[in-house]
């Protein structure tokens, strides 16, 4: 057995005797996150708070256009924190497509936790394009027969269209003296992070915590102990990373927030005074984009869907 596989049976045995917010077998399809999902279940059982709702919200295009034979409608399903970026990019793409093809593209947009969005697409939300937090979520849609195998080879960077790293956002002046991952396990620290059941970003947060132990010489037992202790400091689990930010920034809960660094930079660009630390031991947060083959063929939107995906690069 590999280093990652050895503790799997032990952790699953623990899981069978404890209550969980999500089933372990529901995580087995995550690419490269099989063991992490199992350990995460154990850690979440220690969380002191409840979960947020897991519904996603569908939003109309910024500038709706009445349907006509000259219009094409494209449905984009994405994870929560990409909303601001897409709302800036989409009008530019619409303008370019109109100029090049004399056709107006009308976007339907849906944003929510990556896990929730994945389930919605599999359950019938007819996305033409999906931009999700994890390659494993895209692979779930592939396994459901909606995306053709090899999707990651059809575009640059193996399908990865956005990247970031994990950042620790603190209160002004950093009163808890947060310097690195290990500080999140202090009894006096309350941590805000999203719900891994519904948020791909929250799974990346977990990977950051886990990786901080493994990359500094710890083994799986130490990593499990650490993440379990950290999750005891989590009072509430919002449904996605954007809601986690609101819980921390607008509702004033918690001493520290784990979030994407690009989200923090966006807040600063909007005039927010945000203090944060990027831990030295970190993880590359890679977010894939893919055309949903079955749906674009049904809708007759393959050309524009592929054009939009290429435009994102």
Model-derived features: where do they sit?
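Short, low-complexity disordered leader/linker segments with a strong preference
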Residues: 1-72
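Extracellular/periplasmic juxtamembrane helices and adjacent flexible linkers that interface
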Residues: 2, 49-53, 294-313
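Early extracytoplasmic/lumenal segment of secretory-pathway proteins
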Residues: 47-144, 154-155
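Ligand-binding cleft/hinge of the Venus flytrap
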Residues: 91-101, 182-247
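Alpha-to-beta junction loops
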Residues: 124-130, 188-189, 250-256
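A conserved helix-loop-strand patch within extracytoplasmic ligand-binding domains
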Residues: 142-215
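A bilobed periplasmic-binding-protein/Venus flytrap-type ligand-binding module shared by bacterial periplasmic
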Residues: 165-174, 286-303
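Ligand-binding pocket segment of bilobal, Venus flytrap-like solute-binding proteins
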Residues: 216-281, 288
């Amino acid at each position: 057995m590999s280093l990652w596989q050895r503790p799997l049976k032990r952790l699953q045995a623990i899981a069978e005797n404890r209550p969980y917010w999500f089933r372990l077998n529901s995580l087995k399809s995550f690419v490269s996150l099989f063991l992490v999902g199992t350990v995460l279940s154990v850690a979440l059982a220690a969380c002191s708070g409840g979960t947020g709702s897991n519904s996603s919200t569908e939003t109309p295009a910024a500038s709706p256009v009445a349907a006509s034979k000259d219009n094409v409608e494209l449905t984009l399903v994405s994870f929560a924190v990409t909303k601001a970026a897409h709302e800036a990019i989409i009008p530019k793409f619409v303008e370019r497509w109109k100029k090049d093809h004399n056709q107006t593209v009308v976007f339907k947009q849906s944003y929510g936790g990556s896990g929730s969005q994945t389930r919605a697409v599999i359950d019938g939300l007819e996305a033409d394009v999906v931009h999700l937090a994890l390659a494993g979520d895209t692979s779930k849609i592939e396994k459901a027969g909606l995306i053709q195998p090899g999707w990651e080879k059809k575009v640059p960077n193996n399908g990865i269209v956005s990247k970031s790293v994990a950042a620790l956002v603190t209160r002004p002046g950093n009163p808890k003296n947060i310097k690195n991952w290990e500080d999140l396990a202090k009894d006096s620290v309350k941590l805000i992070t999203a719900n891994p059941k519904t948020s791909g970003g929250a799974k990346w947060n977990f990977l950051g915590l886990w990786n901080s132990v493994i990359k500094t010489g710890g083994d799986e037992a130490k990593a499990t102990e650490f993440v379990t202790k950290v999750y005891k400091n989590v009072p509430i689990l919002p449904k996605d990373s954007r809601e986690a930010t609101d819980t921390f920034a607008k509702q004033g809960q918690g001493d520290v927030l784990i979030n994407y660094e690009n989200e923090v930079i966006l807040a600063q660009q909007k005039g927010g005074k945000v203090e944060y630390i990027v831990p030295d031991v970190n993880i590359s947060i890679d977010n894939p984009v893919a055309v949903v083959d079955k749906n674009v063929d049904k809708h007759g939107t393959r050309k524009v869907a592929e054009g939009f995906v290429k435009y994102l690069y």
